[in-house]
Every structure is written in C-alpha cells, then in structure tokens.
C-alpha cells in the first residue's frame, strides 16, 4: 500500500508517525512532500526512513491513499498543480479543516473516492479521537483500510459530513478546552498556598491516573465519581460547591461557539 502526504505539518506528522509506529505499514511505502521547504522535508523524511519528492506525477502514480494536509488557503494552488496527474487508483483523505468533499472534488476535477477526517493533536501519542466522513463511492474494503490506518493513531468515529462540525468542537478542539480547565485547576490549587510547581506536577499525575481509571474500568464516569464520593465527606463538599454553577450551560456555550465557527469557516472556504 502506497501512501502520499501533501503537507508535512504537525498533524500530518502525528498521523504518519502513528502509522509507522503501528507497524501496519513499511516506512518505505510512505511518501512526503511539502510546499517549498525541501531541507526541512529531507531532514524529517530521513529521520523516519520515509521517502520524499516534489515530482507530483511520480507521487500519485500507484498511490493508494493521498492525504491532503495543506493549509486550506493553499489548497487551490495544490489542486491546480496535481489534478492532471491524478489516476483512477488514487483515493483521497483530507485533513483540511472547513473544505467540503464536494469542494475538494471540484478543485481536483475528480470523482475519485474521498474521505474527510478530523483528528486531534493527541494523535502525537496515538490517542486521537478522529471523526471521519466518506464520499458515497468509498467501497467497504477501502473504508476498512482507512479505519485501520486511523486506528494506528487513535480511535475513529464515522459520521455524516454535516456532523463533522460537531466532532470538530467536541474532540477536535477538545484537548484545548480540557487544557484550559486544567489551567484553572492549577491556578485555584496555587491560591490554597502550595507552590505552583507542586500543584502543577500533582495535577499532571492526577489527570494521568484518572485517565487510566477511565480506560481500565467498565463503569461510567458518573459511577466512578459516585464510588469516591462519601456522604458528608470532603469530596461531597467540593461537588456541592460546584453544583452551584451551571457547568453544563458553560460547556454548551463553549461547544456551540466552536460548532458555529467551524460552519462559518466551511462556508467561507467553499465560496
């Protein structure tokens, strides 16, 4: 299986590094290219043992999956460059935010199978939650192959294209939202009189430990919370204080704003 990556930014790097580390694919079957920084591309490709090239015809020849990972505003130039070299064997996977399947196909002048994926930065550690939407002509065998590729850097959830906006908000932007919550937790802990480095290190380990509990348990998060909450205890007192605030509405506003912005960007790019 030959994979080609157009764009070698942080997200693309996380994806193909995960694929290589999973041993699902030989590094020699992966080809990278970027817009212009050949020295950086060469250095990175040699470090991973993958191929790199600026020859679009050679890149697309016999390519099974072509990842489109350029910045959205650079895509039109890329499409102008590669459309004449597209073959019937090429299936496309876009990681470009805001560009619809119809728009990408129009720019590439092709009806080849195309999928849009929305990973998050946890792909760097093999734990992305990736939303995916397929064009109607993506056959079941190819879908399974794409799922296997994505599972190399996390988990996958298939949704309709219109619901990728919601996935973008919940899981795509999710790490940043959680980092922000943890930042506030550190600030509040520091206000109690402990040294900031002590609080930050403690909360880092708290997050890791809690994540492992969620991962290893069959219980819901609600039940896990109840299991460590004793009536009249310190945990109950803290939860009672939290219940005075409408946390659900806060997150609804947060996610709603992200969904709306995703839709705005999509309409803007597709114009």
Curated annotation (Swiss-Prot):
Q: Name one GO molecular function term.
A: pyrroline-5-carboxylate reductase activity
Record's keyword annotation contains Cell membrane? no
EC number of this enzyme = 1.5.1.2
Positions in coiled-coil regions: none
Q: Name one GO cellular component term.
A: cytoplasm
The answer to whether keyword Cytoplasm applies is yes
Which terms are listed as keywords in the entry? Answer: Amino-acid biosynthesis, Cytoplasm, NADP, Oxidoreductase, Proline biosynthesis
What stretches pass through the bilayer? Answer: none
Location in the cell reads: Cytoplasm
UniProt protein name: Pyrroline-5-carboxylate reductase
The protein's organism comes out as Staphylococcus epidermidis (strain ATCC 35984 / DSM 28319 / BCRC 17069 / CCUG 31568 / BM 3577 / RP62A)
